[in-house]
């Protein structure tokens, strides 16, 4: 359904994230995840899809290796004027208990928690997944790790060209009991990577922006 919220997997947010850097775009998280892609390569371990939306060309490549899922996103401005674009992978990661989870690799980055309105910068290198976590991180390094303490494991995220990250979990101090996503908060953490908000990118006409994550 075109208006359905996607809860799981790796939804692709482009050419804007949320409602855009100026909070004036609809639908939320862009058109890419509501657009049909043409598959141009379909090998057993590599898929490439292309689409065109709002004068922005989208190319998304997914490669599966023995140790990682590698994704590369290219956004091309087909307009005659510069365009501000954002691109994020809204990755859902399964954990044993989100209340015990932490994200490592944030020291020195700035943060803005959109659930609480708080802002600051990280002195420590870890962010705990507490209630009301909807935290946009800017100036983040190329290596993050989700520490899944209850299962004794780490999920590593490595990026290229991705200055932004978002850590989100629907656990809330005012959760409504009839919200199925909120009820499932313990089972997952979203560690999203790409370029968004303060790090949205101005792409010149007939130029492109490429980023990757694994």
Where are these regions (language model features)?
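A generic structural signal for short beta-strands and their flanking turns/coil linkers
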Residues: 6-12, 33-35, 45, 56-58, ...
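Divalent metal-coordination and catalytic microenvironments
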Residues: 39, 73, 206
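Acidic, contiguous internal or C-terminal segments within carbohydrate-active enzymes
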Residues: 50-91, 95
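Active-site/ligand-binding surface loops and adjacent short beta/alpha elements
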Residues: 82-84, 92-164
């Amino acid at each position: 359904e075109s208006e359905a919220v996607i809860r799981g997997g790796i939804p692709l947010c482009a050419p804007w994230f949320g409602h855009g850097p100026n909070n004036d775009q609809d639908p939320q998280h862009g058109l890419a995840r509501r657009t049909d892609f043409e598959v141009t390569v379909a090998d057993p371990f590599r898929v490439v899809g292309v689409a065109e939306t709002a004068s922005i060309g989208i190319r998304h490549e997914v490669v599966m290796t023995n140790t990682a899922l590698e994704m590369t996103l290219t956004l091309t401005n087909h307009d005659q004027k510069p365009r501000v674009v954002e691109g994020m992978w809204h990755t859902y990661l399964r954990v044993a208990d989100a209340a015990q989870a932490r994200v490592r690799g944030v020291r020195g980055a700035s943060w803005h928690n959109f659930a609480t309105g708080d802002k600051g910068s990280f002195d420590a290198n870890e962010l705990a997944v507490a209630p009301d976590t909807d935290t946009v991180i800017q100036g983040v390094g190329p290596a993050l790790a989700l520490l899944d303490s209850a299962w004794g494991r780490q999920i590593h995220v490595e990026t290229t060209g991705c200055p932004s990250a978002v850590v989100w979990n629907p656990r809330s101090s005012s959760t409504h009991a009839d919200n199925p996503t909120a009820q499932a908060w313990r089972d997952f953490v979203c560690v999203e990577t790409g370029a968004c908000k303060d790090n949205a990118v101005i792409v010149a006409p007939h130029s492109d922006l490429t980023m990757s994550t694994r």
